[in-house]
């Protein structure tokens, strides 16, 4: 059940990130048009991770400004049951932290820095 809730929250957050740009009704109509449209929906994986830190507000803003239809995100739960946006189960690749997201509290994660797409601390 917990995994289902986390999945639903991540889907809603991803749609909400772009809803103000094109409108949620526009996106939902394209998702549920029964295959009648030739529209190709563009979804950014982990935000604009090639040009900004992965899953960062900067990357999401670039996606929205660029007209992207949606942003795919993954969510994980911290040790104190807070939900954070993180692609990996671990912090090592994209932050200055080490180990599992679930081993850290939200306050501890807030003390970490993100890394750029080439691993430079931001």
Go through the PLM ranges and name each one.
Residues 52-62:
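Short, acidic/polar
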Residues 41-43, 70:
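Structural preference for beta-strand elements that scaffold enzyme active sites
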Residues 1-24:
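Bacterial Sec-dependent N-terminal signal peptides
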Residues 21-33, 40, 87-122:
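Metal-dependent phosphodiesterase/phospholipase catalytic core, i.e.
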Residues 71-72, 85:
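Conserved beta-strand positions in the central sheet of alpha/beta enzyme cores
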